[in-house]
Amino acid sequence: MMINTQEDKLVSAHDAEEFHRFFVGHDSDLQQEVTTLLTREAHLLDIQAYNAWLEHCVAPEIKYQVISREFRSTSERRYQLNDAVNIYNENYQHLKVRVEHQMDPQNWANSPKIRFTRFVTNVTAAKDKIVPDLLHVRSNLILHRARRGNQVDVFYATREDKWKRIEGGGIQLVERLVDYPERILQTHNLMTFL
């Protein structure tokens, strides 16, 4: 099945390519493996085992990016303005600093302790056509963050990941692009890992 972006004008070329990648060469075993992987990653982040997450899930060459897109009317698209703005654009060292900040006993945001619940859904996975150990993974995320009785935030996002198989049988995250749909944050902050 192919998507004709000339007929389906609301579908971007990127989205059509992603659809083709994930649904034409569907592999049920890979799908199950990746779903289990993302579930384990979500569990580590939910229980705030950030050092374990960095050590076991994140590759040293990670590119971790959270963007927000500006939604324009069709008539405004002719100006070719960049529609994506970085909220985070980080590497391994930046993530490590954020983890250290979370672990700091002086971090007032963790008193009382924050509770997280992540729902990772609509998981699709495909092997890279050129690099056999590279996996393309797309998922949707709902993150519920609760602190005290009255501070509750809910985040929704779409994630496009690249995971690579490493020696010893593990799989590590090498790239994560989080498409966060809110242009203006409706929460206190976005100090979390999506």
UniProtKB/Swiss-Prot annotation:
SUPFAM superfamilies, sorted? NTF2-like
Give each disulfide bond as a residue pair: none
What InterPro entries does UniProt report for this protein, alphabetically? NTF2-like_dom_sf, Rng_hydr_dOase-bsu
Q: What is this protein called?
A: Naphthalene 1,2-dioxygenase system, small oxygenase component
GO molecular function (one): dioxygenase activity
Protein family membership:
Belongs to the bacterial ring-hydroxylating dioxygenase beta subunit family.
Tell me the GO BP annotations in alphabetical order. Answer: 3-phenylpropionate catabolic process; naphthalene catabolic process
Keywords in UniProt for this one?
Answer: Aromatic hydrocarbons catabolism, Dioxygenase, Oxidoreductase, Plasmid
Entry GO terms, CC:
catalytic complex
Q: Which domain of life is it from?
A: Bacteria
Q: What does this protein do?
A: Component of the naphthalene dioxygenase (NDO) multicomponent enzyme system which catalyzes the incorporation of both atoms of molecular oxygen into naphthalene to form cis-(1R,2S)-dihydroxy-1,2-dihydronaphthalene. Also able to use styrene as substrate. The beta subunit seems to have a structural role in the holoenzyme.
Pathway assignment reads: Aromatic compound metabolism; naphthalene degradation
What Pfam families does the record tag this protein with? Ring_hydroxyl_B
Q: How does it assemble?
A: The naphthalene dioxygenase (NDO) multicomponent enzyme system is composed of an electron transfer component and a dioxygenase component (iron sulfur protein (ISP)). The electron transfer component is composed of a ferredoxin reductase (NagAa) and a ferredoxin (NagAb), and the dioxygenase component is formed by a large alpha subunit (NagAc) and a small beta subunit (NagAd).
